[in-house]
Amino acid sequence: MDSVMIARRLGAGGLIAVAAVHVNWARGSAWPASDMQTLAQAVIGRNRMPGAVPCLSVSALLMLGALFVSGFPQHPPKLQRAGALGVVVTLALRGMIGASGRMPHDRASRTFAYWNRRLYSPLCIALAALCAAGLVLPGDETEFS
């Protein structure tokens, strides 16, 4: 397996894992927190979690992103590349803005700020890098040519 395929699979796998967590939250789970209020403070900086529809919407977008990044199923090459590039740009911007401490959450909890700096932003940057590597590393270019 070449480096391009490894990067694509790792990036897509990360997106799928995050999508699964959002589905879990849509079903009412407070994992990994002890209760919903603690979870909400940690993941969005508020006292209440969004409902199932917003959580499932985020999950669906993450899954779509994983399809673009993985190269499966085969989309028209320009659509595939544009979709994967959109994933990279979105994740990179989210990661950089979060890491800079300039997230537009003026009322966000300290718990969110803590986890945003230590987990969410670095995770977004790492996923962006993996997804970008799948676009730019030399390898089998047949999927995106």
How would you name each of these model-derived features?
Residues 1-145:
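Short amphipathic, positively biased membrane-proximal segments
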